[in-house]
Curated annotation (Swiss-Prot):
Pfam families on file: zf-U1 (PF06220)
Subunit structure: U1 snRNP is composed of the 7 core Sm proteins B/B', D1, D2, D3, E, F and G that assemble in a heptameric protein ring on the Sm site of the small nuclear RNA to form the core snRNP, and at least 3 U1 snRNP-specific proteins U1-70K, U1-A and U1-C. U1-C interacts with U1 snRNA and the 5' splice-site region of the pre-mRNA.
Claim: Cell membrane is one of the keywords in the record: no
Protein name (record): U1 small nuclear ribonucleoprotein C
Organism: Coprinopsis cinerea (strain Okayama-7 / 130 / ATCC MYA-4618 / FGSC 9003) (Inky cap fungus)
UniProt keywords, alphabetically: Metal-binding, Nucleus, Ribonucleoprotein, RNA-binding, Zinc, Zinc-finger
Function of the molecule: Component of the spliceosomal U1 snRNP, which is essential for recognition of the pre-mRNA 5' splice-site and the subsequent assembly of the spliceosome. U1-C is directly involved in initial 5' splice-site recognition for both constitutive and regulated alternative splicing. The interaction with the 5' splice-site seems to precede base-pairing between the pre-mRNA and the U1 snRNA. Stimulates commitment or early (E) complex formation by stabilizing the base pairing of the 5' end of the U1 snRNA and the 5' splice-site region.
Length: 209
């Protein structure tokens, strides 16, 4: 697995994984190095960097091909050996200026539709190629019809009945322990003076009312 190089600390991390980078970036030495770097830039340079990032964000474009021109990588030569291109096939400096290419549809997502088109044709199936497997919902039926087809495994059950048999004994809860009735909670055992619970009376001490 390729190693990740931290420009601020001038070190290679053990692996290039999100958890390792997150742990490194929250470390005391890394934060001190970042703070020292930006403090050495001066107010005008830092403000110009902020303006570049803000204008790129507002225009909806990615960073310029060479980056924004800040960070330690622009002050010194890269380490020997170079780096492999980032995983996923994206260009090293981000997307080029201009409109970004659409991402290819993954499995389970419909292809790009023309602007203003409804997501699915009314009372019909989704367009061909929209889903790789069976449709998640059946086509729209007449108004007032149930959203799902009746279950074929039900033998004469009423509409809306569950598609599985109820458990033995129905849906009632567990039976109460022997010696208790099923009507409400059990009465308190030997209430204390004035109807107070014995634990509370004990906590309050003698004559604690």
């Amino acid at each position: 697995m390729p190693k990740h190089y931290c420009d601020y600390c001038d070190v290679f991390l053990t692996h290039d994984s999100a958890s390792v980078r997150k742990a490194h970036n929250s470390g005391r030495n890394h934060l001190a190095n970042v703070r020292d770097y930006y403090a050495s830039l001066g107010h005008d340079k830092a403000q110009s960097i902020i303006d570049q990032i803000t204008s790129a964000f507002e225009s909806g474009q990615g960073p310029p091909p060479g980056g924004f021109g800040f960070g330690p990588q622009h002050l010194q030569a890269p380490p020997q050996g170079g780096f492999a291109p980032p995983m996923g096939g994206f260009p090293p400096g981000g997307f080029p200026p201009g409109p970004r290419p659409p991402f290819p549809p993954g499995p389970g997502f419909p292809p790009m539709m023309p602007p203003g088109a409804p997501p699915f044709p009314p009372n019909a199936m989704p367009p061909p190629g929209a889903f790789g497997g069976p449709p998640p919902f059946p086509p729209n039926g007449p108004p007032g019809a149930p959203p799902f087809p009746p279950n074929a495994s039900q033998q004469g059950g009423p509409p809306g009945a569950p598609s599985f048999p109820p458990p033995p004994g129905g849906f009632n809860g567990p039976p109460p322990p022997s010696g208790q009735n099923s009507q409400g909670p059990p009465p308190p055992t030997n209430p204390g003076p004035g109807g107070m619970h014995p634990d509370r009376a004990r906590m309050m001490g003698p004559g604690g009312r």
